[in-house]
Amino acid sequence: MKKFLKMTAAFSLGLSLAFGLFSPAQAAPDTSVSNKQNFSTDVIYQIFTDRFSDGNPANNPTGAAFDGTCTNLRLYCGGDWQGIINKINDGYLTGMGVTAIWISQPVENIYSIINYSGVNNTAYHGYWARDFKKTNPAYGTIADFQNLIAAAHAKNIKVIIDFAPNHTSPASSDQPSFAENGRLYDNGTLLGGYTNDTQNLFHHNGGTDFSTTENGIYKNLYDLADLNHNNSTSDVYLKDAIKMWLDLGIDGIRMDAVKHMPFGWQKSFMAAVNNYKPVFTFGEWFLGVNEVGPENHKFANESGMSLLDFRFAQKVRQVFRDNTDNMYGLKAMLEGSAADYAQVDDQVTFIDNHDMERFHASNANRRKLEQALAFTLILARVPAIYYGTEQYMSGGTDPDNRARIPSFSTSTTAYQVIQKLAPLRKSNPAIAYGSTQERWINNDVLIYERKFGSNVAVVAVNRNLNAPASISGLVTSLPQGSYNDVLGGLLNGNTLTVGSGGAASNFTLAAGGTAVWQYTAATATPTIGHVGPMMAKPGVTITIDGRGFGSSKGTVYFGTTAVSGANITSWEDTQIKVKIPAVAGGIYNIKVANAAGTASNVYDNFEVLSGDQVSVRFVVNNATTALGQNLYLTGNVSELGNWDPAKAIGPMYNQVVYQYPNWYYDVSVPAGKTIEFKFLKKQGSTVTWEGGSNHTFTAPSSGTATINVNWQP
């Protein structure tokens, strides 16, 4: 759903909002902690578990793996789930306005200490898994994890786990004794290791040089034992493992290294999640400075998960921290990403994380960080704050960006910026669901508006720390009146006076000033703000959030197919739960009509799957191509494009697992279904179809498969 309107715009926040945190009694269904499909109303706080708080010293590793002073940042420092529970219960997180936490991968990691260039390294970070069905004892037990879930939910905080199914742990093909040989366990039972891999659980194609997407998927990431997702044992194991964590009550998943796993397998993984217990899921696909990445957008639009918005993070750092771009560049990024992502509001924004240098430098002006936080918290998308950012932590690359949090002060300006703005995501639907418009801009100043129905929020930012800005000619969607700065002048903001037609009186925005103004009003007509999940099979219940649906059941439309009655399992003014009807697989627009027949806006690009999904590798031999031609796959199911060359799967690969003129691609297809398919060559708008009759293949009911055929001239 495109939500950046390419015209001048501004955020307006009205006086009608009370600025306290929502209590459980006040929470609308769409803003509730029980809403696992929608994080648009949430603020995520990313916690590197080992570096946050040591609540139970008894579970700390012993010997050379542990440094209680946290001087050696490659060793365990003692943070655990009990420490997070303590900071939930003492009000540090709730007081900041945090409504979701993203914690380190909770699974059991290797115990070996690995010496790299004379420096000891441990699995403190959680990314060196050995058993995806057990916990990391340095973080806590299963009971401790359940206590964390319960404590978080009691304080209206959702829990997201990091999950890294790309690999296990460091391994060497030449030295079976290196570390733990990448060994994989199933709840304590050994499945296999990297050497003597008779079951083919892992890839053995060498290390990636990152030169192509294919190279990054089917070769090892550094020295990490790369899991073979086309292996049925690996596939079923990983899908069973995530179901275990879903059963433990998690509310979301952050998928590590999605650029480095087969896209078809990941779509089948998301189908398994959505068909079981759907939760908000977002992946990590790194983008560098000024990198746009069409494959990144395609993945976000078609995989069933959203992404960490590195494009956003890199541009915000350029504009607010490094001064290497200006507000016009920031605006162009916002408009570009809104056009490229089908559901831009589901992408997760941030200004720093564990894979980047900290935003704040030790001697830098703190106002830069404070402005970046304010900008991020009010924008469309789901904001995530890296632990310690509110304490102005600094640090370069890994591991210096992963130090222990120095304090839990609630008096820093950064903490208070978050505290004042985070609650608005639940109290003003313009911030959670609204369109975005630029209203006033020059090199240093951006004023933008979020609007949803009659709800408005306006943000003004002057990044010039030395010169005030004279603002004239500003027009907003705010009703006539006077609006106080929601930040209360914390960042030198001012009151805004608005006359008839939304015209604001001229004013001066202070040097380094940031102000937020808002207005809220009831929404009389049905307006959809969010749908989740955005991909599932018929019969799965999805959640539609917004405003103005009314209290009596109406009708939900998937394209022209109407759903009513018992197939709508819940209908409230801000939320509808509905079962996907028995329609053919494909892309559908969703809309709602209330009991009186008044129709809502259209929410587009919902994918109905043809059924349960499995990952199948399609291989075609001896398909020669001319320079500039690529090979694609299509067939008689929507997952293969329904014979439409424009929707065909590809371009296929031909370098790593199979080599030219043989091609391959891993695709998510309906389980147990007999599929007809063909290959085709594309070069620009020119399409050359494979000859002969259609190939046929029956997909397995579970696990994975490979279908290998010859090109038919």
Curated annotation (Swiss-Prot):
Binding site for substrate: Y127, W128, H167, N220, L221, Y222, D223, R254, K259, H260, H354, D398, R402
GO MF term set: alpha-amylase activity; cyclomaltodextrin glucanotransferase activity; metal ion binding; starch binding
EC number: 2.4.1.19
Catalysis: reaction(s): Cyclizes part of a (1->4)-alpha-D-glucan chain by formation of a (1->4)-alpha-D-glucosidic bond
Annotated Ca(2+) 1 binding sites: D54, N56, N59, N60, G78, D80
Cofactor binding mode and count: Binds 2 calcium ions per subunit.
Family note: Belongs to the glycosyl hydrolase 13 family.
PROSITE patterns, alphabetized: CBM20 (PS51166)
Site for Transition state stabilizer, residues: D355
Listed CDD domains: AmyAc_AmyMalt_CGTase_like (cd11320), CBM20_CGTase (cd05807), IPT_CGTD (cd00604)
UniProt xrefs under InterPro entries: A-amylase/branching_C, A-amylase_C, Alpha_amylase, Carb-bd-like_fold, CBM20, Glyco_hydro_13_cat_dom, Glyco_hydro_b, Glycoside_hydrolase_SF
Domain CBM20 residue range list: 608-713
One GO-annotated biological process of the protein: carbohydrate metabolic process
Active site per UniProt: D256, E284
Purpose: This endo-type adsorbable amylase is capable to digest raw starch.
Compartments where found: Secreted
Keywords: Calcium, Glycosyltransferase, Metal-binding, Secreted, Signal, Transferase
Domain IPT/TIG, residue spans: 526-607
Protein name listed in UniProt: Cyclomaltodextrin glucanotransferase
Cofactor: Ca(2+)
GO cellular component assignments: extracellular region
SMART domains hit by this protein: Aamy (SM00642), Aamy_C (SM00632), CBM_2 (SM01065)
